[in-house]
Amino acid sequence: MASQGTKRSYEQMETDGERQNATEIRASVGKMIDGIGRFYIQMCTELKLSDYEGRLIQNSLTIERMVLSAFDERRNRYLEEHPSAGKDPKKTGGPIYKRVGGRWMRELVLYDKEEIRRIWRQANNGDDATRGLTHMMIWHSNLNDTTYQRTRALVRTGMDPRMCSLMQGSTLPRRSGAAGAAVKGIGTMVMELIRMIKRGINDRNFWRGENGRKTRSAYERMCNILKGKFQTAAQRAMMDQVRESRNPGNAEIEDLIFSARSALILRGSVAHKSCLPACVYGPAVSSGYDFEKEGYSLVGIDPFKLLQNSQVYSLIRPNENPAHKSQLVWMACHSAAFEDLRLLSFIRGTKVSPRGKLSTRGVQIASNENMDNMESSTLELRSRYWAIRTRSGGNTNQQRASAGQISVQPTFSVQRNLPFEKSTVMAAFTGNTEGRTSDMRAEIIRLMEGAKPEEVSFRGRGVFELSDEKATNPIVPSFDMSNEGSYFFGDNAEEYDN
């Protein structure tokens, strides 16, 4: 990793701390988890939820969304200035599911945002605890990444649906700060920039005046974040070009799409964190576990240990498979939507299947769905091994990948070769190497052609037994390379709709 020294670790981003040592970081992340847990316990009390109802992931999502909406200042301001019929800008709520007379009932609750903010601050020692809020946003984002394939969004910005492995964090709100930026994939950053450039093309005042100055600095900041994710000089030089453009337009969009495509082989570094639902933290805190005292890390064994000892339930629709629902949530918990399925199967200890083979829809239940035949079941979120999360893209090499998704973005730092469909990717690079970025383009193509199938990423890194907390004995897995490695293989996952 170039410039490793200048980058803050993500625990530092997570804790807005300058230079902290490992113990301080662990305590600081633990404190954030404690706050989420305490808030969740208090909300379950307010809503009079039984222990079982409090461990229902659908209730967790509603409670998380309520607090995120209560702190969404921009949207709150917008709602007050543009009142819409039947929507009280000062209130927030959602569906809460309760067990009544042997069946599940939906109850719509409504709370004052002010009241929710008070409960949240109280659980966080009077602080706004933005990091805890961001943590929940990342959990929602990881769940979206596992549940939906962003085909439409990719096509709309002129990218190819097969590039879905670059789309981590594409549903994260803009206000998710540095920790949010760290987990966004290359494609997500490119898409945000393209949307911005398109607005500038259609609206001549977009880059002008007082507002235009702010817009411009946001544009340059996003370019720099994207540049920092690339690992080769040529890709970074290309980002400098895009950033310095006087009047960003179609040439820049071309360059951005080119660089996104190149990231299928010359992968960028994207952070991964295991962010769990609030209904996991709540019961742990109420059982007396002190996260701040014990310390916690989002990228080590801690989330695995926590999930080994947690009971989480989910509502199951009549024709859904509970094991498939469990896989979906397990992948989301570990931010593993774009990881190689063979590695995931090894770590989890049960076969992890591509999205299109899962008989399950999303975790959330729409307000018009019939509750009569809803069952609930335990989510199996335990694992056989654990592994360290990575924030590098691994080095780049080649192996046959699938029709749907043609590359992976590694989540775990474990030795393997990373699959991608070289011929498919390279086919997109014929022709257009003229223009001002021609030398960079030529260099990027040269690097991609040099990528070798035999090359191993994360050499010597392995998975660990759950009893091996200090990560002393790496177990390097061996894979059956004939198996399918991509999750969104020629896929029919539903679209994500806001």
Swiss-Prot record:
Regions of compositional bias (Basic and acidic residues) in chain numbering: 8-21
Compartments where found: Virion; Host nucleus
Alphabetical list of InterPro entries matching this protein: Flu_NP
GO BP of this protein: symbiont entry into host cell; viral penetration into host nucleus
Residue span of region Disordered: 1-21
One of the Pfam families matching this protein, by short name: Flu_NP
One GO term describing the cellular component: helical viral capsid
Coiled coil: none
Motif position, Unconventional nuclear localization signal: 1-18
The entry's keywords: Capsid protein, Helical capsid protein, Host nucleus, Host-virus interaction, Ribonucleoprotein, RNA-binding, Viral nucleoprotein, Viral penetration into host nucleus, Virion, Virus entry into host cell
GO molecular function: RNA binding; structural molecule activity
Assigned protein family: Belongs to the influenza viruses nucleoprotein family.
Role description: Encapsidates the negative strand viral RNA, protecting it from nucleases. The encapsidated genomic RNA is termed the ribonucleoprotein (RNP) and serves as template for transcription and replication. The RNP needs to be localized in the host nucleus to start an infectious cycle, but is too large to diffuse through the nuclear pore complex. NP comprises at least 2 nuclear localization signals that are responsible for the active RNP import into the nucleus through cellular importin alpha/beta pathway.
Quaternary structure (record): Homomultimerizes to form the nucleocapsid. May bind host exportin-1/XPO1. Binds to viral genomic RNA. Protein-RNA contacts are mediated by a combination of electrostatic interactions between positively charged residues and the phosphate backbone and planar interactions between aromatic side chains and bases.
Name used for this protein in its record: Nucleoprotein
Species assigned in the record: Influenza A virus (strain A/Memphis/3/1988 H3N2)
Lineage: Viruses, Riboviria, Orthornavirae, Negarnaviricota, Polyploviricotina
Gene name per UniProt: NP
